[in-house]
C-alpha cells in the first residue's frame, strides 16, 4: 500500500490544484481553484479550448471593457470548477475575490453570482464550496450564506480566534494553514522543526482538538503544506488539501501511516461565542496571524490583478 492510499484511509484527500491531469491521476475526493491556479491553467493544454470558448462568449455578451473582465473572471472560475466536478465525487471550492475580504455584502453578492453560474451549467450548489478569507466580514458573509444553503470554505486561517469565530458561525469547512505558519516562525527564529514540533502542525492539531472536543460540526481541512512530514503529522485530520508534488511523494513511497489526530471526546459544554471585539483583539495579539492574513489577502489580490490584466489583453 502506498502512503497516499494509507493516508486516504485516515483523512479525506483534496487536490490543491486545478490541473485536470493531476486530478485524474491522484483521484482526490475534492479539489479547489483560486486566481493563482487559474493563471497556471493558461499554460495547461487541457484548458485552452475552455478558455477560448468562455472569453468568446463574454465578448459577445458584454460591451463594457471592465465589466467584461469582471465577468470573465467569474465565468472562467466556474467553467474550470465545472470541469473539475466531472472528475471528482465531492466538491470544488471556488474563491470570492480577495479584494472583497472586508465587504460582507459584496462577498455575499459575489457568492450568489458564482452559484448562479454553476447552476446555469447544471452544477448544483451541493457540489460547490464558496471560498472566503477568514476576516470578520468574510465569516459573517459565510454565516449568512450557510443559512441559504450555500456552504463555505474559510481560508487564510492562522489563529484560534479565526477558527472559533468560524465554529460559532456554523461554516461548513475551514482551511487552517500549516506551511505559512511555519514559514513565519522559521524566519523569526532561524530554527528547523521536526514534524512533532512544527508550529503549523501544532496549530492545526489544536484547531482539530477544539473542533472535536466541543463537538463543532465544521470540517477542518489542513492546508498549505511544505513537506510530506507536515502532512503525515496531521494524519487523521478531517481533510488535507495537498499539492500534486506532495501527492506524488506520497504515492511513490510504500508503508503504513500512524494516526496523529483522533476524536478526543465530548466536552460538557461549548466555548462561549467570540464577539467582534474579542476576535479583533485575539488577531491583533497574534503577530504571526495578523501578518500572514494580511499577506495572504495581498497575494491573492495580486494574483487576481494579474489574471485580470491577462484577460483584459485577451478580450481586447
From Swiss-Prot:
It comes from the Bacteria. GO terms for molecular function: transaldolase activity. PROSITE patterns: TRANSALDOLASE_1, TRANSALDOLASE_2. Keywords: Cytoplasm, Pentose shunt, Schiff base, Transferase. It is found in: Cytoplasm. Pfam families: TAL_FSA. One of its GO terms (biological process) is pentose-phosphate shunt. Its main location: cytoplasm. Its EC number is 2.2.1.2. Pathway: Carbohydrate degradation; pentose phosphate pathway; D-glyceraldehyde 3-phosphate and beta-D-fructose 6-phosphate from D-ribose 5-phosphate and D-xylulose 5-phosphate (non-oxidative stage): step 2/3. One of its GO terms (cellular component) is cytosol. The active site is at residue 131. InterPro entries: Aldolase_TIM, TAL/FSA, Transaldolase_1, Transaldolase_AS. Homodimer. Transaldolase is important for the balance of metabolites in the pentose-phosphate pathway. HAMAP family: Transaldolase_1. NCBIfam families: PRK12346.1, talAB. Belongs to the transaldolase family. Type 1 subfamily. This is Transaldolase. It comes from Chromohalobacter salexigens (strain ATCC BAA-138 / DSM 3043 / CIP 106854 / NCIMB 13768 / 1H11). The gene is tal.
Amino acid at each position: 500500500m502506498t502512503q497516499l492510499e494509507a493516508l486516504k484511509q485516515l483523512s479525506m484527500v483534496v487536490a490543491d490544484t486545478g490541473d485536470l491531469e493531476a486530478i485524474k491521476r491522484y483521484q482526490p475526493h475534492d479539489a479547489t481553484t483560486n486566481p493563482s491556479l487559474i493563471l497556471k491553467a493558461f499554460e495547461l493544454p487541457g484548458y485552452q479550448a475552455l478558455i477560448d470558448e468562455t472569453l468568446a462568449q463574454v465578448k459577445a455578451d458584454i460591451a463594457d471593457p471592465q465589466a467584461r473582465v469582471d465577468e470573465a473572471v467569474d465565468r472562467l472560475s466556474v467553467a474550470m470548477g465545472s470541469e473539475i466536478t466531472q472528475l471528482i465525487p465531492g466538491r470544488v471550492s471556488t474563491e470570492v475575490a480577495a479584494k472583497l475580504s472586508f465587504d460582507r455584502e459584496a462577498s455575499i453578492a459575489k457568492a450568489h453570482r458564482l452559484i448562479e453560474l454553476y447552476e446555469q451549467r447544471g452544477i448544483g450548489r451541493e457540489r460547490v464550496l464558496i471560498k472566503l478569507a477568514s476576516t470578520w466580514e468574510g465569516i459573517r458573509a459565510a454565516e449568512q450564506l450557510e443559512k441559504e444553503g450555500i456552504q463555505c470554505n474559510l481560508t487564510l486561517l492562522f489563529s484560534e480566534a479565526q477558527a472559533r469565530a468560524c465554529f460559532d458561525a456554523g461554516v461548513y469547512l475551514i482551511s487552517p494553514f500549516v506551511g505559512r505558519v511555519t514559514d513565519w516562525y522559521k524566519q523569526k527564529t532561524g530554527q528547523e522543526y521536526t514534524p512533532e514540533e512544527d508550529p503549523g502542525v501544532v496549530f492545526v492539531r489544536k484547531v482539530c482538538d477544539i473542533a472535536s472536543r466541543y463537538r463543532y460540526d465544521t470540517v477542518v481541512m489542513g492546508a498549505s503544506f511544505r513537506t510530506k512530514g507536515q502532512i503525515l503529522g496531521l494524519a487523521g485530520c478531517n481533510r488535507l488539501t495537498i499539492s500534486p508534488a506532495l501527492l506524488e511523494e506520497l504515492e511513490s513511497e510504500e508503508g503504513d501511516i500512524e494516526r496523529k489526530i483522533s476524536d478526543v471526546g465530548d466536552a460538557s459544554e461549548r466555548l462561549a461565542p467570540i464577539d467582534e471585539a474579542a476576535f479583533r483583539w485575539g488577531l491583533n495579539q497574534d503577530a504571526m496571524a495578523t501578518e500572514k492574513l494580511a499577506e495572504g489577502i495581498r497575494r491573492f489580490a495580486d494574483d487576481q490583478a494579474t489574471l485580470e490584466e491577462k484577460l483584459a489583453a485577451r478580450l481586447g
